Amino acid sequence: MGITGMTYMFTMVLSLIVLIFSASTVGFDYFQFTQQYQPAVCNSNPTPCNDPTDKLFTVHGLWPSNRNGPDPEKCKTTTMNSQKIGNMTAQLEIIWPNVLNRSDHVGFWEREWLKHGTCGYPTIKDDMHYLKTVIKMYITQKQNVSAILSKATIQPNGNNRSLVDIENAIRSGNNNTKPKFKCQKNTRTTTELVEVTLCSNRDLTKFINCPHGPPKGSRYFCPANVKY
């Protein structure tokens, strides 16, 4: 093989290595830890929920995200090995239920893993590490929005609440970093708080201010007062 051929071969091998590395490491800036208020999710959903709801914020998902540009999705085709969930199941069914269909909790976790969790490498190592990380954040690190609001004496009694009061309460349990809100109208006059997102750096080692939420005029924009 001549010098030209060797150069070509070296270039091809190097390109393959770069391609493999790129496929396993997807760019993202930070994580969104999004929790949804169960009654509001069911009220805003076109199809009624199959089962009664709890007045709790429970996990929607943990999502690698970008401040600018699209968020990564479905970075690998690696499906979740649900047989390994084992003794985590009981905790996950409480903190991360499929609110719309409680007979399909595992399917919900599998879809969240495939769409979002597969893009969290190297912070998220694999499917079981994804589930364990969510449990750690919600329970051990006390990133439970319902508990944070309750500590600030903001209870889910169905009244209109100042969004500023809700934000201040969450900041007090979140190192004074800005959360993100998602709301939705369930009647002409009533807008419910549907989701609260807490944001962390890409290593999940500290809270950061969330980038802006839904813009004014969006169907998910939160007004000054919301039902909770």
Swiss-Prot record:
The keyword Calcium does not apply. Glycans are attached at residues 87, 101, 144, 160, 175. InterPro entries: Ribonuclease_T2_eukaryotic (IPR033697), RNase_T2-like (IPR001568), RNase_T2-like_sf (IPR036430), RNase_T2_His_AS_1 (IPR018188). The keyword Nuclease applies. Gene3D superfamilies: Ribonuclease T2-like. One of its GO terms (molecular function) is ribonuclease T2 activity. One of its GO terms (cellular component) is extracellular region. PROSITE patterns: RNASE_T2_1. Its EC number is 4.6.1.19. It is found in: Secreted, Extracellular space. Pfam families: Ribonuclease_T2 (PF00445). RNA binds at residues 36, 60, 98-99, 108, 111-112, 115-116. Belongs to the RNase T2 family. Self-incompatibility (SI) is the inherited ability of a flowering plant to prevent self-fertilization by discriminating between self and non-self pollen during pollination. In many species, self-incompatibility is controlled by the single, multiallelic locus S. This is Ribonuclease S-4. It comes from Pyrus pyrifolia (Chinese pear).
